[in-house]
Amino acid sequence: GHDCVMDPWYSLGSADMLEVASMGLHVAQMTGVEQMQACFHAITEVPAAILGLEGYGLEKGCNADLVILQAADPVEALRLKANRLFVIRRGKIIAQSEPLQSNLDLPGRPKSENFLKQS
């Protein structure tokens, strides 16, 4: 396993499992959509199932522990190492970030871009 925590054994850690998954996808050359979705699943739902956590998931009666990402889907979350808009624990927002937006100054181009897929 890999927890990506900055400690004496791994000084480059950021505690960011999206970063770990992205690195793994690149190293293993897992660029197929199904492979990327499986990798996202491996850092989200699979660990809770392996640990036998109860009250985990998006169903009535669950703990409501979740992270809302600025991404349209799992592949985009991995591609962009998506911004965390909200971190929710037991139904309470414990961290919040503004959506990322890049301002541009290029003639004939939009004034801003968020690099998300357009629907």
Regions flagged by a language model, labelled:
Residues 40-119:
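Active-site microenvironment of metallo-dependent hydrolases
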Residues 1-69:
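His/Asp/Glu-enriched, well-ordered alpha-helical/loop segment
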